[in-house]
A protein has these predicted regions:
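Structured mid-to-C-terminal alpha-helical surface segments
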Residues: 1-27, 38-40, 53-222
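Glycine-rich beta-strand-to-loop/alpha-helix junction loops that act as flexible
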Residues: 29-33
């Protein structure tokens, strides 16, 4: 658990430095780490995910960002790929690598202005984030694409926050089918390692009961 606390401090340190270096102007913070740092998602995640608001000179952006990050960290990996820019940062102050992924595809999505913060850090950063309604859409797409238990967890988290799960009947049925495919190992190991001990037992026993009931109710209503 201490490693995860340190990793959260690492995330905020890097976000703060990206902001100070003016690398976030055209980026939108998304994914599970955004939900945790900006909206209180109660599971751990290990990477920083960004979308873009407009196309950029990617070779130049990558070059500048790489040189900037190398002032502070060792780069375990870095790549300017066709669809994404990737960095893996290593620091002697922190036990884990930190992955940064910037998706080059320009997406028309709604954004909010949010503060990334943690009770484990004194750093706070105001930044553009994916609006929660669009985050719900993204998480549904992700779960249907890769079937990862963490995406289902995030969908239920957003649902409990009052974010509507707007989807057609076909998508609702696919979600129900996907939830049924999740195994005991998904809950005990994959999800269990991302949760505090106090929450692990609940999800092992109840799984995504709230989400499943909501999906059934929506299907009955239609």
């Amino acid at each position: 658990m201490r490693d995860l606390v340190k990793h959260e401090q690492f995330e905020l340190e890097v976000i703060d430095r990206l902001q100070s270096g003016r690398f976030l102007a055209n980026l939108i913070f998304g994914g599970g780490t955004m939900l945790r740092l900006c909206h209180g998602l109660d599971r751990y995640s290990v990477g920083l995910d960004f979308w873009v608001t407009k196309d950029m000179d990617w070779p130049e952006y990558y070059r500048r960002l790489e040189q900037y990050l190398m002032q502070f960290y060792k780069l375990a990996d870095s790549a300017n790929k066709h669809f994404t820019i990737l960095f893996e940062l290593k620091s002697p102050q922190y036990p884990r690598l930190l992955k940064i992924e910037i998706r080059k595809e320009t997406r028309v999505i709604k954004t909010d202005t949010s503060i990334a913060y943690s009770p484990n850090s004194t750093v706070q950063v105001m930044m553009k984030t994916v609006a929660l309604k669009d985050m719900m859409k993204s998480k549904i797409e992700a779960f249907l694409s890769r079937g990862e238990v963490r995406d289902a967890y995030d969908i239920e988290f957003l649902l409990k926050r009052g974010i509507p799960l707007n989807a057609d009947n076909e998508t609702l049925n696919k979600l129900v089918t996907g939830l049924k495919k999740l195994s005991k190992t998904d809950f005990s190991v994959k999800l269990g390692t991302l949760l505090d001990a106090s929450k692990r037992k609940y999800y092992q026993e109840n799984k995504f009961r709230i989400l499943e009931m909501h999906l059934r109710d929506k299907l009955k209503g239609e």
